[in-house]
Amino acid sequence: MWFKNLLIYRLTQDLPVDAEALEAAMATKLARPCASQELTTYGFVAPFGKGEDAPLVHVSGDFLLIAARKEERILPGSVVRDALKEKVEEIEAEQMRKVYKKERDQIKDEIIQAFLPRAFIRRSSTFAAIAPKQGLILVNSASPKRAEDLLSTLREVIGTLPVRPLTVKTAPTAIMTDWVTTQKPADDFFVLDECELRDTHEDGGIVRCKRQDLTSEEIQLHLTTGKVVTQLSLAWQDKLSFMLDDKMTVKRLKFEDLLQDQAEQDGGEEALGQLDASFTLMMLTFGDFLPALVEALGGEETPQGI
C-alpha cells in the first residue's frame, strides 16, 4: 500500500475516538450499491481484504488506514439532451404548442429516472492514513473534493472531526522559484527535470517543461521575465520522488526500489503481510519526510484562533 498522491490535513485537537470506536462508527455507513433510482452512494470499505470480517480500520503500530468508496451511475449528458430534444419536438408537433421551461424540466427528470437503471456504474475508492500522535490525516488523492468527501463522511459518523489543511508560512511558489533560480534547494531535496512556470498576472502564459535541464539559460530567462514555478518535480534523500504544486499538494509519489524491496522482505509471503509492511514503512518514511518538507517551506502556519 504505497500512496501515489498526498493531501495533508492537520488535526487541531486529538482524534475523539480510538481505533475500536472508529471501527464501530464507520460501520454505521458502509459502502453499498446504488439502488435503481439512485445516482450515487458513498460509504466505508475495508482498506485490506474483502468480506464481512475484514476490518474497516487497519491498525499498524501508531497508524490507522481507512478507505471509502463512491459508486455512481454514469448518465452522459448528451444522451439526456438528445432524448429531451426528441420528446419536446414530438409534443410540440402533436399538440401544436410550445413546451416551456417548467414542463421541459419535468420531462428531463422523467427521462433521467427512466434511463438510470440502465446507466453504467463507476466505482472509485479513496484511502486515508491517520497518524494520531503526529496529529495528521493524509489522504491518497490529488483532488480536494475527493478528500473532503471522505473527511466529511468521517465527521458525520464520528460526530466531530477537528481538521484543516496543513498550511506553511512561505508560499510554495516562492520557495520553488527560489530553488530553481538559485539551484540551491533545501537540505536532502533535489530538483529533478520537470516544472510548470506561470506568469503572475491572470491572463499570462504557461510553460510546462518535461525532461529538461532546469538549470539551463532558457529556464532562467523565463524566471527573469517574471514567471514563477507553480509545479516542480523533486526527490527527497534516496527514498522518494514527487511533484509539488503551489497548493502544497504532493503528486506522483514514487518510492524508491530500496524501500519497496525492504517492505517486500518485511512482509513475508502473504499478500496481507506485504500490504501491511508497505503501509507501515511508508508511514515511517512520511514521519521524516513531511517535517522536512514543512521546514523547507518555512515551517507550519497556524491560523489565528486555532
Curated annotation (Swiss-Prot):
HAMAP family: RdgC (MF_00194). GO terms for cellular component: bacterial nucleoid; cytoplasm. Its main location: cytoplasm. The keyword Cell inner membrane does not apply. It holds the Pfam family RdgC. This is Recombination-associated protein RdgC. GO terms for molecular function: double-stranded DNA binding. It comes from Pseudomonas fluorescens (strain SBW25). GO terms for biological process: DNA recombination; regulation of DNA recombination. InterPro entries: RdgC (IPR007476).
